Curated annotation (Swiss-Prot):
Name the UniProt record assigns to this protein: Aquaporin Z 2
Oligomeric form and interacting partners: Homotetramer.
Note on domains (UniProt): Aquaporins contain two tandem repeats each containing three membrane-spanning domains and a pore-forming loop with the signature motif Asn-Pro-Ala (NPA).
Keywords annotated in UniProt: Cell inner membrane, Cell membrane, Membrane, Plasmid, Repeat, Transmembrane, Transmembrane helix, Transport
Organism: Rhizobium meliloti (strain 1021) (Ensifer meliloti)
Amino acid sequence: MFKKLCAEFLGTCWLVLGGCGSAVLASAFPQVGIGLLGVSFAFGLTVLTMAYTVGGISGGHFNPAVSLGLAVAGRVPAASLVSYVIAQVAGAIIAAAVLYVIATGKADFQLGSFAANGYGEHSPGGYSLTAALVTEVVMTFFFLIIILGSTHRRVPAGFAPIAIGLALTLIHLVSIPVTNTSVNPARSTGQALFVGGWALSQLWLFWIAPLFGAAIAGIVWKSVGEEFRPVD
């Protein structure tokens, strides 16, 4: 179990460093900013690369919502859920701390949103709480459906990380304007701790919505995809 938790810690750490790091450090860098498209691909690439790297050790969740959805679908033992979530949140916090140290090394650095998730006046596009809630539930739901389907034993081996990485990229392309895209409570927690204030007060949504969407996906998969469940 220790090796699995280390893998989840490292994977989540890389996701936040690569994804949130691109948003904080490179999204609007003078003249060569990567923009929304670049940030979206950065998040997808972090999952793709780490899924190939440590997926064989822990399953490559890097996300409390993914762990919950897989547990509800019967893919992983529920007993490991709490340990996985702790490792994931710890990885996200450490990565956010490293990113903060790097970002504050710039003379004119301003914290701003620090890639934190938000709704209302803290939504990149000014979207309401309801819009943010629906977006996070729906996007996490489909993210889990894609994960559950692409990791099935009847699907050609070795391609799941590609499908999952591209799915996360697409999710970010759609939802960055709405919430700055969470679908991952650990990723949201790490950034919110350093922003404080409004980010912490709105953090509840970025736990409840992804976990709810993931749980529904697990239930749906057990019903719709029951015949395709892999052999343990």
